[in-house]
Amino acid sequence: MADTDIVRAFLAENAEGDLLAWSHQVEAMRRFGLSCAEAEKIIFRAGLLPKRYQRNRRMISTAQQERLFGSRVAVVGCGGLGGYVLEELARMGVGHLVAIDPDSFEEHNLNRQLLSSPSTLGVGKALAVARRVGEVNPAVEVRPVQASFVSDRADALLAGAAVVVDALDSVEARLELTAGCAKLGIPLVSGTIAGWFGYVTTVFPGEKTLERLYSRWSGGRGIEAELGNPAFTPAAVASLQVAETVKVLLDLGTPLRNRVLCVNLLDMDVESVPMDAFPTSRS
């Protein structure tokens, strides 16, 4: 790799204030034999900001943007919720993503799943994520895992993740995921959707939020199988999950801890429900 001081001098010469345009980042990659991620790392260390993140800066500082770039987030489920979550995390500049899903795209996904199209039918969802992120933000590293999450493999699948995002479509899998996150001490941002409705909650290690939320679940398919899933509900709930994820990564604001944000898009009503409203154990 080229001498970092020489690279920094090139970047400083071509910066617009403290912003560096994509064309100059590409030229630095070509001239000095850098990967996109290597170039972006040097840009941040030089006190500069890639211009793609310019509109983030009124919300977060350059130092916080660099922190996002150094963060790893695992997303379990790459369909309706997960596709939007992964796209938004990549656009926000989270530098390391793990995309976990055993399935491939089918025709019934076309109405709502961001990464599904006639050209991706039959393509593994996790692999489609890697391709899409490579197009949207090539500096982001994606590890696609074409497999189901199982708690026995939690160490391998979630290693190094600062946050895990639950974008699953079954209660059983969701409870297994929360157990794996608890074991590893990783915060979990959980979301689910059904028809016009959805919820988001954030579970920190030691909390039993999902166990209480599903205390009366008796097995079988979730309510989404009855109410269906349109295009807009996953987009709305996924955006809330990404906001929660960024807050946890950067220690900003007030997370949805020990409460559930219930979203009703039919009546345009949003309610924050404390966990005290739910049973304390499964019965």
Residues covered by each model-derived region:
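E1/E1-like adenylate-forming module used to activate ubiquitin-like modifiers
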Residues: 2-24, 144, 149-150, 155, ...
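Glycine-rich phosphate-binding loop and adjoining beta1-alpha1-beta2 segment
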Residues: 40-41, 100-137
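Hydrophobic residues within alpha-helices
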Residues: 85-86, 129, 177
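N-terminal charged helix/coil linker that caps or initiates catalytic domains
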Residues: 1-73
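Residue-level detector of anion-binding/catalytic polar loops
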Residues: 95, 141, 187
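Core catalytic loop region at the nicotinamide-binding pocket of NAD(P)H-dependent oxidoreductases
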Residues: 252-263
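Glycine-rich adenosine-cofactor-binding loop
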Residues: 64-101
